[in-house]
Regions:
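Short, flexible, mixed-charge acidic loops at enzyme active sites
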Residues: 103-114, 207-211, 388-399
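Metal-dependent amide/peptide-bond hydrolase catalytic core
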Residues: 238-434
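Extracytoplasmic/secreted proteins, especially bacterial periplasmic and envelope-associated proteins
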Residues: 22, 29, 33-36, 40, ...
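Bacterial N-terminal signal peptides
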Residues: 5-15
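Acidic/His- and Gly-rich active-site-bordering loop/insert found
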Residues: 19-127, 132-153
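Divalent metal-coordination and catalytic microenvironments
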Residues: 41, 62, 80, 92, ...
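Histidine/acidic-residue-rich, glycine-tolerant segments that coordinate divalent metal ions
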Residues: 114-126, 132-133, 145-267, 272-278
Length: 434
């Protein structure tokens, strides 16, 4: 499925980086190693908080570049610090973890990895969210910054964060002393590769970048029995089905039109055999919103509707509604985003830096921001430009993050990521050592 078309690719690379030949040469100098690391990581993904080999590979490479590296921060987290005279401390973060997804990209280096998920099930594992691109680009950026210390001053702090997909990894690192054992940064930087832009472009968003997220586990209680005698039972499967349908009215009938709100029931678990009515059913929900008041409205509505459906079904007791995870939206400091747009345009070309609206996905980088660290989180284009153009013309969507078919166009995406990160860091780290 992977295609390498040499002429368009070469033209794209030249277009992306032609605005700054120096950055282009620096990126080419580290590209081969970065791409080799990307392929290795893609073939060997690891689930949240089990990223032992991923973390070790990152730590080894950063040590080799002269960074002071600390492992096992917040579990499998990595912190690498490079001091270069007086000046600000700037943090650049990558995630380490992959997802329990069976890869179907057809790539020559597709993952065949398996692991045990938290409940103990054997699952396929894939870098279906692009964290392998993020790690490889961070290492390439780290190499450029280490080799060109005459172009900046201050302290560069690199973070390899575990458990982003569990939206708890950032908090674990903070709780383990991330900003007390190590320098607290003046600014934080991160990116995310997505197919919402073609490879070679980056997206800039001022203010709210993504959504609040809440994960709920709902247990509905019934009365089990024989499948041939449903009248002697209180069927939690039917209760679950009615609850799922009723929950769909929250967005369509309760939230003000125009407000972003998502209520997704992503998992349903009940029963063991066709002729056994179980005594309980479990739902897994994901809620998304931009505004705090909408977030609270969604949570309250889910609770009200779930309890009402259980009461209507004659449930023997109230449902158990557990808030198993949540995170606030990532907020891009507007003055910082405005400041960094210029260096990005200089490095990539003005046409390759676009303004983007907030996205509906979520992530826990917001926990770093909540520690009083103004930040800039931007989108890295990942789509093959030809496929992107064809999809836009046809009104179709390319495979998104978390899809088993998600396969960023790695070559131009990696080059663009490194050029962008270097440009941003040099701007914030202010020129030659003082």
């Amino acid at each position: 499925m992977k295609r390498i078309v040499l002429l368009p690719f070469a033209l794209l690379t030249a277009s992306c980086l032609a605005q700054n030949p120096t950055v282009s040469r620096e990126v080419e100098g580290v590209y081969a190693d970065a791409h080799a690391l990307y392929v290795d990581l893609h073939q060997n993904p690891e689930l949240s908080f089990h990223e032992t080999q991923t973390a070790a590979k990152l730590a080894q490479r950063l040590r080799g570049l002269g960074y002071e590296v600390t492992e096992h921060v917040g579990g499998t987290g990595v912190v690498a610090v490079l001091k270069n005279g007086d000046g600000p401390t700037i943090m650049l973060r990558t995630e380490l973890d992959a997802l329990p997804v069976e890869e179907k990209t057809g790539l020559a280096y597709a993952s065949k990895a398996h692991a045990q998920d938290p409940p103990g099930h054997d699952v396929a594992v894939m870098h279906a969210c692009g964290h392998d691109v993020h790690i490889a680009s961070l290492v390439g950026t780290a190499a450029i910054m280490a080799h060109t210390k005459n172009t900046w001053h201050g302290t560069l702090m690199l973070i390899g964060q575990p458990g982003e997909e569990a939206i708890t990894g950032a908090k674990k690192m903070i709780d383990d002393g991330l900003f007390t054992r190590f320098p607290k940064p003046q600014y934080g930087i991160a990116l995310h590769v997505m197919n919402r832009l073609p490879a070679g472009k980056v997206g800039v968003t001022e203010g709210v970048y993504n959504s609040n997220s809440d994960a709920l586990r709902i247990t509905l209680f019934g009365k089990g029995g024989h499948g041939s005698m449903p009248n002697t039972t209180v069927d939690p499967v039917v209760m679950a089905a009615r609850t799922i349908l009723s929950l769909q009215t929250i967005v369509s009938r309760e939230v003000k039109p125009g407000e972003m709100a998502v209520v997704t029931v992503g998992s349903v678990q009940a029963g063991t055999r066709p002729n056994i009515i179980p005594d309980q059913a479990e739902l897994g929900l994901s809620l998304r919103s931009y505004k705090p008041e909408i977030r609270q409205q969604l949570l309250a509505a889910v609770t009200r509707i779930t309890k009402a459906e259980a009461l209507a079904a004659g449930a023997p007791k109230e449902p158990l509604i557990e808030h198993v995870g949540g995170v606030e939206f990532v907020y891009n400091d507007p003055p910082l985003a405005q400041r960094l747009r210029g260096p990005l345009e200089a490095a990539l070309g003005k046409d390759n830096v676009v303004t983007q609206p907030p996205i509906t996905a979520s992530e826990d980088f917001s926990n770093f921001i909540a520690q009083g660290i103004p930040s800039f989180y931007f989108t890295l284009g990942g789509a093959d430009p030809d496929k992107y153009a064809a999809a836009m013309a046809a009104g179709e969507a390319l495979p998104s993050n978390h899809s088993p078919f998600f396969a960023p166009d790695a070559e131009p995406a990696l080059r663009t990521a490194m050029a962008a990160e270097v440009a941003v860091l040099r701007n914030l780290l202010g020129g030659p050592p003082q």
